[in-house]
Design a protein with these regions (language model features):
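Short, conserved beta-strand element in jelly-roll/cupin
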Residues: 148-167, 224-227, 232, 256-259
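Double-stranded beta-helix
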Residues: 167-237
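Non-heme Fe(II)-dependent double-stranded beta-helix
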Residues: 2-40, 46-141, 147-149, 274
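Generic beta-strand structural signal
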Residues: 120-127, 137-139, 154-160, 170, ...
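A short beta-loop-beta micro-motif enriched in histidine and acidic residues
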Residues: 110, 143-155, 218, 225, ...
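Short, structured patches in soluble enzyme cores that scaffold and shape functional sites
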Residues: 129, 143-145, 160-164, 176
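Short, charged/polar surface micro-motifs in flexible loops or helix N-caps
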Residues: 120, 133-136, 165-167, 180, ...
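Non-heme Fe(II)/2-oxoglutarate
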Residues: 2-23, 71-73, 184-192, 227-232, ...
Length: 294
């Protein structure tokens, strides 16, 4: 099938964007999970969270969107048909902190996983990146370190789809081995040390994810996600998303977990500042890349 990746139309599955492999068979084998993370830069775990909890949370978020006139009237609520601009849902309050939503993004399944993975108690940022991504929207290629690199060296992102999300609706796309391939070393040593608030530079490495693999190697992987699936990855794994070609909101949430004993990025602590450069002029990433030689 033809999908859109950034602004390019590509075939899926193909050598350009292949199919993710499920690592859930490794659950309970922490050394194997850590090895897989070190090799690929991510873990795709199907059905880690109870599906019914996720669907309940999806309904709650859609009711919130409906109340803010972001859905087409007289269409099935659970279809999530776009009818207006999505309200802001990220943060430390509002619908992101509804008990139904917290039952997913602060679920016992996630804490149980990370407590075992870190071999110590885990904590999660209280800031929640809950999103509704609309038609023709996508996420450019980037590494998460640039947004939250001041704390734990063992910080991990967890991406949770709120419902079944086919590739054409805007799924997460991973660039395997970008966390350690030699061909990505220059990126990791320049862009990968960026702090968007300190350095006042745009956060996406490129708006054209295909540029990454064209210039630096590796490939891209995604899948049709289902409610209950999670993607877990480190701060220096390059990732992006497909473009939402549907008329339905793609609802998802990014959350972060780390060992409780590690330092926490002060921007994302309880009552932290969040991004301090949000309203300041920033250097275009193209200028920064020219200076870095990447």
């Amino acid at each position: 099938m033809t999908i859109r990746f950034g602004y390019r139309d590509v075939n899926y599955p193909s050598g350009i964007i292949g199919e993710l492999r499920d690592s859930s068979h490794l659950l309970g084998n922490v050394p194997a999970l850590r090895q897989q993370m070190a090799e690929d830069g991510f873990l795709f775990l199907r059905g880690l969270i109870d599906r019914q909890k996720v669907l309940k949370a999806r309904k709650t978020v859609l009711q919130h969107l409906e109340a803010h006139e972001a859905l087409v009237p007289d269409t099935p609520l659970l279809d999530g048909v776009m009818g207006g601009r999505s309200p802001q849902m990220m943060g430390r309050k509002g619908v992101a902190y509804h008990p139904d939503v917290l039952d997913v993004i602060e679920s016992e399944e996630l804490f149980r996983f990370f407590d075992a993975y870190f071999a110590e108690p885990s904590i999660t940022y209280n800031y929640k990146w809950l999103r509704a991504v609309g038609n023709e929207e996508y996420t450019g290629a980037h590494m998460d370190f640039v947004y939250m690199g001041r704390g734990s060296a063992n910080l991990h992102t967890t991406w949770v789809p709120f419902g079944d999300i086919p590739v054409e609706q805007g799924t997460l796309v991973m660039c395997p081995e970008s966390n350690h391939l030699d061909s990505f070393a220059r990126i990791r040593d320049t862009y990968g040390r960026l702090d968007v608030d300190r350095d006042l530079v745009e956060g996406w490495f490129t708006k054209d994810p295909m540029e990454i693999t064209d210039k630096f190697g590796s490939h891209w992987l995604t899948t049709n996600f289902e409610a209950g699936d999670v993607m877990i990855f480190g701060m220096h794994t390059m990732h992006a998303s497909t473009t939402n070609l549907t008329t339905r909101w793609r609802i998802s949430c990014d959350i972060r977990f780390q060992p409780a004993s590690d330092p926490v990025d002060e921007r994302w602590k309880h009552k932290g500042t969040g991004h301090t450069a949000a309203n300041l002029p920033v250097k275009p990433i193209e200028e920064a890349r020219a200076e870095w030689g990447v």
